[in-house]
Amino acid sequence: MKQILFVGLGLIGGSLASNLRYYHDDIEITAFDADTSQLDKALSIGIIDYQSTDYKTSVENADIIIYATPVQQTVKYLQDLPNYQLKKHVIITDTGSTKSTIQQYEQFLLNHDIHLVGGHPMAGSHKSGVLNAKKHLFENAFYILVHNETDNDAAFEEIQHLLQTTSAKFISTTAEEHDFVTGIVSHVPHIIASSLVHLNAQHVEDSSLVKTLAAGGFRDITRIASSNPIMWRDITIENKNTILRILKEWKNQMSDVINIIEHNNPDELYDFFNDAKVYRDQLPLKQQGALSVEYDLYVDIPDKPGMISKVTNILSLHNISISNLRILEVREDIYGALRVSFKNPQDRKDGADALSDFDTYFD
């Protein structure tokens, strides 16, 4: 039996453990977590075989160690690994959102016959903790794997083979490229979304409508600002240099936009909006990227009693689950008065088919 050790067993670690436990008969899973209540819960729902409060014994018995901990905590673990009597050719991977800080230890560990393959599963949920773990959490999500040394090629292949059951889409890249791309598509957008929310909050006293009307499109485009602030504080610190470089580019672009508006140039304004529209319309629709995704269907319903229950009853009859449902009070540029959110694009498509008697729309 191959021995797999999880260090950290929250939503991500728990979901990976759940998937491996379900699909692999040739492994045993042990978990170590400072929060022992997470271990008790994981054991009770059957996603691990053993729980451990003895880190030293656990790492020394493991064939593969998966660190599902914050990046700075993972770094401390990596620095300390050569002090233990680990198995020959032990493989290490992680689930951190930044990779450069982790991968700088690849050669250091390789000198001790410890094989590091950095990992970043680009999936998550607004819920946390092992009780919210799902074995299918990573389906169709991008899963980044990083290694620089050819001596880690075999470890890379073994980790990818082990994780194939997640049905994730694996991408191999460098730590530098990973941190640059996630900075553009995830980290900086989170900062901008939070900034927009702060801007809204600063003007609430000017008019109560600022908050009231934010219930529509503004709330949608700033949804990511509701993410875990501790996690995003740490990500921002870890990817500081890349984030600052991108933010300065964005600042310059905003200066250009201000200049266009000040000079009342309609052609340049049109180009600004149209170029963005054309590029965005070309972005993939069915792939889960760096930002968490909700698959929304907009349904046009009349303002009559029983219409919402009619929609949900139809979906229930077709065994289609929904993750959220909301009446849109402010829906400028959005078709439909009811927004129904689904867990995946297939459920959304099935929902649209089931609700064919209604006018529906999704992006």
UniProtKB/Swiss-Prot annotation:
The answer to whether the entry has keyword Oxidoreductase is yes
Which E.C. number(s) belong to this protein? 1.3.1.12
**Top-level taxon of the source organism:** Bacteria
Q: Which reaction does it catalyse?
A: prephenate + NAD(+) = 3-(4-hydroxyphenyl)pyruvate + CO2 + NADH
Annotated signal peptide? none
Which residues belong to any copy of the Prephenate/arogenate dehydrogenase domain?
2-291
Arranged from A to Z, the UniProt key words for this protein are: Amino-acid biosynthesis, Aromatic amino acid biosynthesis, NAD, Oxidoreductase, Tyrosine biosynthesis
Domain named ACT: residues: 296-363
Q: Which family does it belong to?
A: Belongs to the prephenate/arogenate dehydrogenase family.
Q: What is this protein called?
A: Prephenate dehydrogenase
Q: Cite the source lineage.
A: Bacteria, Bacillati, Bacillota, Bacilli, Bacillales
Q: Which gene encodes it?
A: tyrA
